[in-house]
Swiss-Prot record:
7-phospho-2-dehydro-3-deoxy-D-arabino-heptonate binds at residues 127, 143, 149, 159, 191-194, 243, 257-261, 264, 280, 351. It comes from Lodderomyces elongisporus (strain ATCC 11503 / CBS 2605 / JCM 1781 / NBRC 1676 / NRRL YB-4239). NAD(+) binds at residues 42-44, 80-83, 111-113, 116, 136-137, 158, 176-179, 187. ATP binds at G861, M862, R863, A864, A865, G866, K867, T868. Residues 392-835 are annotated as: EPSP synthase. Pathway: Metabolic intermediate biosynthesis; chorismate biosynthesis; chorismate from D-erythrose 4-phosphate and phosphoenolpyruvate: step 2/7; Metabolic intermediate biosynthesis; chorismate biosynthesis; chorismate from D-erythrose 4-phosphate and phosphoenolpyruvate: step 3/7; Metabolic intermediate biosynthesis; chorismate biosynthesis; chorismate from D-erythrose 4-phosphate and phosphoenolpyruvate: step 4/7; Metabolic intermediate biosynthesis; chorismate biosynthesis; chorismate from D-erythrose 4-phosphate and phosphoenolpyruvate: step 5/7. GO terms for cellular component: cytoplasm. One of its GO terms (molecular function) is metal ion binding. Keywords: Amino-acid biosynthesis, Aromatic amino acid biosynthesis, ATP-binding, Cytoplasm, Kinase, Lyase, Metal-binding, Multifunctional enzyme, NADP, Nucleotide-binding, Oxidoreductase, Transferase, Zinc. This is Pentafunctional AROM polypeptide 1. SUPFAM superfamilies: Aldolase, Aminoacid dehydrogenase-like, N-terminal domain, Dehydroquinate synthase-like, EPT/RTPC-like, NAD(P)-binding Rossmann-fold domains, P-loop containing nucleoside triphosphate hydrolases. Residues 854-1044 are annotated as: Shikimate kinase.
């Protein structure tokens, strides 16, 4: 057994080895005599063989050596969330109960949580007992166990309460690591890399070379760490020795020890927010990169060191950005909580700070810290580094008069050098290589294909490439290239040379979203013509590509169009020496684009030993011999001439001087001519030697425009030229840059659009741009979101120059995009040009939370799914135009579709259909409903267009109905072209396409009557309002409830649903309890539920078995699909279980749209008491994922469990909490819960036993009995009121809901009496006001609702804050009118766009308001006294009101009439004559449904009702309906509850 010992604080107390459990036991018992030894670990560790062996050995050895001593063990739950005061106290209580004294020796066996917390226990128990650290994770071995720092966490931060307490021994047994999962091993490597980065470059270099072997071993199906134990021991020792040395020099962290906190200032802040999902090492890894970038920003650390650190961490599988795909998946929705203010707040309470000053360790180079101490850093600098947007402040006169800038290596040369070196034989040292995203992707790809071995020297400045002579092999991993266009083109050609392996037969190249739009077809065509087999995996002509290995490169003559990108030409040139036959490459069709880049490639091939000869007989034709590149010993990459244009342009714009010391006239790069060909004619002084270039700008405001400049030799530099031209005198026209339209973005359009924000006019030409310069004083500061960079590095850098010339700071989005070619550009701007930068955090709105506004909506679905009808309704509802794409196609082609299909076939029709879809999405992107044909999803291209539309935030709505009904309908419809397949087969084929192309789904219930159609129209309108964001669920200010439906098939209980749900605020659909969980069945159930409970929000729940439901826990993918389908159905609320995988949680949260989220957790065992930290963690998790509500359900075993819950509720208020206990003893919790309490109903007979469910009535009765509800009194006031039905209505509802309220009459015509005798009573609950007090009562109201103000009358009074803040006057008469029409299916009424009000009194005003709310465009007025009507017209100036004259009465179109004249008095003959004309002209028939509402409820049938119904067949609504509907609205205002409609209706009618 080999054991390495490390001295710390003068004592060799750190022992490192492999399989040293026996040594741990012997040393502890021999050296640390004690009556009691206590092994403390966690419940996970205790199950491992290594722990069991240690405990058994200790027991046996103790019996031999110290038989009088005893061994105790104590286990705590695992995880950082248990490293707290409570757990520490539990451990201490255990020690006290066991009679432990000051001679006790504690062994802390576990990871950092155990080491930290048990070390702190040892430090404080009996004022300090001895402790032995036995770290079992890599992280704890190299970090927390060494140095005596012990602590626990609090809610305010990590490790804030603790002590320095040195362990007697630290035993690092590397064999313990065998028990760790892969992620935990990787996690530990962060601290290892950190230690080497701050202290020992030699060790850092060793770690770089060890990464591949380490990752391969721990990733094996059955890892065997013994095979790498020597390297692992070296790894642990390397870190431990550094930490021991530092601790020995600075035990209490006074100075030097602070260096160990590199990466922790930012890393700890990130960890505090992302724990427990993100691990310590992962956060420190990201923190190291951010702090290294901070050092670079401050001009201390070279960019190459940042790149090297980044590459090393990534090589170990550690995240280097929170945006990394895998890390983002792990942390899920918590990523949204990484707000800069929150992070800085966490940094401000870091232990190593000096007061409120943030201190941070700055790296000077790999292996060395700046000035060997932590430095004060400013929040402003952190903000720049931590955010991806930046404000560029005016340059003013802060910049130096002259400066020398060395840009990073040329991207073009760097990428070519890496390809040539990888294909070559031998080792080459590449200096000044560009360290950027592009070259990182290139390096990673070369290594993945085993084309070369890559290492670093000179602190990362030199890249050592050992080429394998063109021997490349297929790899399993996808090669991800981000948005690296150069890398994608070069590697596509290189991949054609790849050989297959036993397991892998192809190479896949992919990239980000923009890369998957960029063209590569011309290169792929050339390769496939030459024998390669390349498949497009997504969009034709773009990445991702699958390239079959082993086909080789045939060679011979290859022709490419001269207009082809020079990168395609270079790709083939560089691979040509490895073809089977010598290659002749001919560029045909004119002068090649970017000839200089082709010349560059040929010159570099020569440097690597291959001579390309130019044909003497054919223009633009090259002969490439078969050969193998020979790598030169050293290759120096020239600085990037395109990047050099930015500092040179800075000088031009600011009347300063800038020198680029390593780019001159001898450069191979076309952009090296920028200074001479562009800046000099614009008025700059230019001095250029063969190796350097200096530009001095003219006096500010004197730059001259360039009338004509062909920038074809330096196309990338046109953006820089454009921003200089923007402030030059005159118009500049740039040509020869057509290829810039297909770069990272359409750069020409981008320049036109973004220059406009600065007040600079520019327009596109056929192959360039024309810019009309402005005076500096006329340059505008872009408002709003500032400059959009389109994820294009050159757009960002160009506009960072123009931004500094504005009067105010300018926002630049996506600043990190410059990492493509110049990662340190912002650092140069800040530290070299003294520009003031300010980081800005864009707070993104929830995905989908924006209202749809006027954006067009696309409709898809099968034939006969109701697309025509529902599209028409949708257009009406949104006031959009309806465009039927089939009709548009017929009009465009001047042919009937049926005939078109018959003559030219379905394929031709589909092709034309696709063209029309793309055209309409482009032309009619706003204010339209685009209704498509059923087969739009048959083609890949239209499917892609639809999916892209949803990705961009547009709505694609899939309409569907019962398939049998669809079949029945289509079989009877001769007007449509016949399907060639069976309809059901067509549906089966298309179903998955409809789902993947749409982001919303609406199921239409089958309608057989006008009433059902009217209801469907109402349901559909509500659905549309939800998905467009116009009407989303809002939590009531009062107590709220939901009722749960547990039926397997709602079709069997439709009437029951309405009765049991109407008094709740939402209805829960338990999807897991349905008869089956097929999406079609669920859609049907939701459709039915919506049709029955039209006004109620739907809570969509899929509960797993472990959470008291029926859905299988193991079917995570099925759960994800069901939740996503719920979102697609546009449900109001969705229940998201907190035990779901982080990826499921993240997807639901990110795609929630306008659906509210309940984050839920259930414990039906009763083992978790409410003072257990697990509940706190679950609540915090719900908060962290940004759920709208958190629902936590426990099981009450005692009555006191309810009191513990209430204490928990008081302490956790960040998000609304639904907190209840199940079980009979938990009923009190349901009574006390205020937010969305689950309730049952008296009519539900099959209630679950033992759950403790209560009805709303039972809850209210119990709440009254314990003082939670107080008695209240309500009155109807006015005169006469003795026959009012209001008391009957309200008292019936109180009784039904168990409310301790009383409603009575108060007869008076004196408002003052009402105020003094009723409204001042402590039990006052509210008033129903009738004549003659509707106007007089207003003076006693401190507030009036908008409806009361406009109508001018109050019929409802409620106290504000129990009357302490006065009284609210409202009007519910208009709601009574509007809801009476709605309940009578007004949606299908003819001429609904126009209404008529008969009468001129107070109720007429409410009628006008109601008709307007129902969407009547014009409202006619009719009364005996026309002067009264003019007063009404004047009172509603914004409404289209018209007094109905006798001559027009028989000709106007009217669908809704409200009669507001007394029902028990004779009517004026003239008025009746006019009314007769209206009724006659609009009488009902089979197609029309005109409606008349009688406002008077006495007598039951009035003369007007009789005339309308009997003579003209109008549907009449008696006044009693208005009374009930008005009372229902009034009841809700008074109590906050919804009245049971049947109950109040019956109470009013049964006099």
């Amino acid at each position: 057994m080999s054991i390495e010992k490390v001295s710390i604080l003068g004592k060799e107390s750190i022992h490192v080895g492999y399989g040293i459990q026996s040594h741990i036991v012997e040393e502890t018992i021999k050296c640390l005599a004690s009556s009691t030894y206590v092994i403390i670990s966690d419940t996970n560790m205790s199950k491992t063989p290594t722990y069991e062996k240690l405990q058994d050995s200790f027991q046996k050895e103790l019996a031999k050596q110290r038989p009088q001593s005893r061994l105790l063990t104590y286990l705590i739950p695992p995880g950082e969330n248990h490293k707290n005061r409570e757990t520490k106290a539990e451990v201490e209580d255990f020690l006290l109960q066991q009679g432990c004294t000051r001679d006790t020796v504690i062994l802390a066996v576990g990871g950092g949580v155990i080491g930290d917390m048990i070390g702190f226990v040892a430090a404080t128990f009996m004022r300090g007992v001895r402790v032995v650290q036995v770290p079992t994770t890599l992280l704890s071995m190299v970090d927390s166990s060494v140095g005596g720092k012990t602590a626990i966490d609090t809610e305010l931060g990590k490790n804030f309460i603790g002590a320095f307490h040195q362990p007697e021994f630290v035993f690092c047994d590397v064999s313990f690591l065998q028990t760790l999962p892969k992620r935990q091993l990787i996690n530990g490597m962060a601290e290892v890399v950190k230690t080497a980065a701050i202290w020992d470059e030699t060790e850092f270099t060793r770690l770089e070379s060890f990464a591949k072997r380490f990752l391969a071993e721990i990733s094996a199906p059955t890892p065997n760490l013994e095979s790498i134990k020597d390297e692992l021991i070296k790894t642990v020792l390397g870190s431990v020795r550094v930490k021991a040395f530092v601790v020995s020099a600075d035990e209490k962290e006074g100075g030097l020890r602070n260096l160990l906190n590199f990466g922790h200032t930012i890393g700890h802040a990130i960890e505090a927010i992302l724990t427990p999902e993100a691990l310590h090492g992962e956060c420190v890894s990201i923190g190291m990169i951010k702090e290294a970038e901070l050092s670079r920003y401050l001009g201390i650390l070279p960019p190459s060191a940042v790149a090297r650190l980044s590459k090393c961490l990534a090589a170990y599988g550690l995240p280097i950005s929170v945006d990394e795909k895998i890390f983002s998946k792990i942390i899920g929705a918590k990523k949204n909580n990484l707000k800069i203010d929150s992070l800085i707040k966490k940094m401000l309470i870091d232990k190593k700070n000096d007061g409120s000053k943030i201190r941070c360790v700055l790296l000077e180079s790999i292996g060395k810290c700046y000035e060997s101490k932590a430095h004060q850093i400013f929040k402003e600098d952190i903000q720049v580094v931590m955010t991806d947007e930046v404000f560029v402040h005016p340059f003013a006169n802060r910049h130096p008069e002259s400066v020398s800038i060395t840009p990073p290596g040329s991207k073009s040369i760097s990428n070519r050098a890496l390809i040539l070196a990888a294909l070559g034989e031998g080792t080459t040292r590449i200096k000044n290589l560009l360290h950027s995203d592009d070259t990182k992707h290139m390096l990673d790809a070369v290594v993945l294909m085993k084309g070369a071995t890559v290492s670093f020297e000179d602190s990362g400045d030199t890249v050592v490439v050992q080429g394998h002579g063109g021997k490349l092999f297929a790899c399993k991993e996808e090669i991800y290239l981000g948005n690296a266009g150069t890398a994608s083109r070069f590697l596509t050609a290189v991949a054609a040379l790849v050989n297959s392996t036993q397991d892998e037969k192809s190479v896949t190249l992919t990239g980000n979203a923009r890369m998957q739009e960029r063209p590569i077809a011309a290169l792929v065509d050339a390769l496939t013509t030459n024998g390669s087999k390349v498949d497009y995996l997504n969009k034709q002509g773009s990445l991702p590509l699958k390239i079959e290995a082993g086909n080789g490169f045939k060679g011979g003559r290859i022709e490419l169009a001269a207009t082809t990108s020079s990168q395609y030409v270079s790709a083939i040139l560089m691979c040509a020496p490895y073809a089977e036959k010598e290659v002749t490459l001919s560029l045909v069709g004119g002068k090649p684009i970017s000839q200089l880049y082709i010349d560059m490639t040929i010159a570099m091939m020569k440097d690597f030993g291959v001579d390309v000869t130019k044909s003497e007989t054919e223009e633009y034709t090259y002969h490439i011999p078969k050969s193998v590149y020979q790598n030169p010993q050293e290759y120096v990459v020239e600085s990037d001439a395109s990047s050099a244009t930015y500092p040179l342009a800075f000088a031009a714009l600011t009347n300063s001087s800038c020198t680029i010391p390593n780019i001159g006239s001898s450069s191979l790069q076309g952009d090296a001519r920028f200074a001479v060909d562009v800046l000099k004619p614009m008025g700059c002084t230019v001095e250029q030697t063969s190796k350097s270039t200096t530009v001095t700008g003219p006096p500010i405001g004197t730059l001259k425009a360039l009338p004509e400049i062909d920038m074809e030799p330096m196309t990338d530099a046109f953006l820089t030229a454009s921003v200089v031209a923007a402030v030059s005198q005159g118009t500049t026209t740039i040509s020869g840059i057509a290829n810039q339209r297909v770069k990272e973005c359409n750069r020409i359009k981008a320049m036109v659009d973004e220059l406009a924000k600065f007040g600079v006019s520019a327009d596109e030409t056929e192959d360039g741009i024309r810019i009309h310069g402005v005076q500096l004083r006329d340059l505008k500061t872009p408002g709003g979101r500032g400059v959009k960079t389109y994820d294009d590095h050159r757009v960002a850098m160009s506009f960072s120059l123009l931004a500094g010339l504005c009067k105010d700071p300018v926002l630049i989005q996506e600043r990190s995009t410059t990492g493509k070619t110049w990662p340190g550009w912002w650092d140069v701007l800040h530290s070299k040009f003294n520009a003031k930068l300010e980081g800005h955090e864009y707070i993104r709105q929830r995905s989908g939370s924006l209202r749809n506004g006027d954006r067009s909506i696309v409709i898809i679905g099968m034939r006969a799914a109701g697309k025509t009808t529902l599209s028409r309704w949708l257009a009406e509802h949104l006031n959009f135009k309806l465009l039927d794409l089939d009709q548009y196609l017929e009009k465009k082609l001047a042919v009937d579709i049926k005939l078109l299909v018959k003559e030219k076939g379905w394929d031709y029709f589909r092709e034309k259909e696709t063209e029309v879809l793309n055209e309409c999405l482009e032309k009619f992107g706003k204010g339209h409903i685009l209704a498509t044909g059923g087969g739009i999803v048959e083609g890949e291209k239209p499917r892609e267009a639809l999916k892209n539309y949803t990705k961009s935030g547009g709505i694609v709505l899939h309409l569907h109905r019962d398939l049998k009904e669809t079949v029945n309908f289509l079989s009877k419809d001769p007007t449509r072209p016949a399907y060639s397949d069976d309809i059901e087969e067509v549906w089966k084929r298309r179903e998955k396409w409809y789902h993947e192309c749409s982001n919303y789904h609406f199921y239409s219930t089958h309608c057989t009557s006008e009433a059902e159609f009217a209801n469907l129209k109402l349901v559909f309108a509500k659905f549309v309002s939800k998905i467009t964001g116009d009407d989303t669920f809002v939590l009531p200010a009062t107590r709220s409830t939901f009722v749960t439906l547990t039926y397997p098939d709602l079709r069997k209980v439709p009437s029951l649903i309405k009765d049991v749900s109407e008094t709740s605020n939402a209805v829960e659909l338990r999807v897991d309890l349905l008869a089956n969980q097929e999406t079609a069945y669920i859609a049907e159930q939701i459709g039915l539920l919506r049709s029955v409970a039209t006004d109620l929000p739907i809570l969509y729940t899929v509960r797993t078995k472990s959470q008291c439901g029926q859905y299988p826990d193991e079917d995570e993918e099925g759960m994800r699909k069901l939740l996503m389908f719920g979102l697609k159905m546009g449900v109001d609320i969705i229940d998201l279980q907190l035990i779901s995988s982080p990826s499921t949680i993240a997807e639901v949260i990110s795609k929630r749209g306008h659906t509210k989220i309940i984050a839920s957790h259930h414990d039906f065992t009763g083992d978790l008491k409410w003072d257990n930290v697990e509940w706190k963690n679950k609540y915090a998790q719900g908060v962290s994922i940004d759920a709208d509500f958190v629902k936590l359900v426990g099981m009450a075993k005692t009555f006191d469990d309810n009191l513990l819950l209430e204490n928990f509720r008081r302490q956790n208020t960040e998000k609304p909490l639904i907190g209840i206990n199940m079980g009979p003893q938990g009923k009190l919790s349901r009574v006390l819960n205020k937010v969305l309490t689950p309730v049952t109903h008296e009519l539900i007979t099959d209630k679950p036993i033992g759950v403790g469910q209560l009805s709303l009535k039972e809850i209210n009765q119990a709440l009254f009995q314990i003082g939670g509800l107080l008695e209240k009194e309500f009155w109807v006031v006015g005169s006469p009121v003795s026959h009012s039905r209001s008391p009957a209505l309200h008292n019936a509802a109180y009784a039904a809901l168990g409310l301790p309220y009383k409603f009575d009459i108060f007869e008076t015509d004196d408002a003052e009496k009402v105020y003094s005798q009723l409204m001042q009573k402590p039990t006052f609950g509210g008033l129903a006001v009738t004549i003659p007090l509707k106007l007089d009562i207003k003076k006693y109201c401190t507030e009036l609702s908008e409806s009361a103000k406009l109508i001018g009358a109050v019929n409802t009074v409620t106290p504000i804050a129990d009357g302490r803040k006065g009284f609210l006057g409202d009007n519910t008469d208009w709601i009574g009118i509007a809801n009476s029409f709605k309940k009578a299916d007004f949606a299908l009424a003819s001429g609904v766009s126009n209404g008529l009000v008969v009468g001129g009194g107070g109720t007429s005003r409410a009628a006008i308001f109601a008709l307007h709310s129902l969407g009547c465009q014009k409202i006619y007025l009719l009364n005996r006294t026309e002067s009264k009507l003019q007063d009404l017209v004047d009172s509603f100036p914004d409404y289209d009101l018209e007094i109905l004259l006798e001559k027009n009465a028989s000709s106007v179109s009217i669908g809704l009439v409200v009669s507001c004249v007394p029902g028990d008095k004779p009517l004026d003959e003239t008025l009746m004559k006019k009314l007769d004309g209206v009724l006659s002209n609009n009488k009902g028939d089979k197609q029309t449904r005109p409606l008349l509402l009688e406002a008077a409820y006495k007598p039951r049938v009035t003369p007007i009702m009789e005339l309308a119904k009997e003579k003209y067949d109008w549907t009449v609504i008696p006044g009693v309906e208005m009374l009930v509907n008005q009372g229902e609205a009034q009841f809700k205002l008074h109590t906050g509850y919804t009245a049971p409609y049947k109950v109040i209706h019956s109470a009013v009618l049964n006099e």
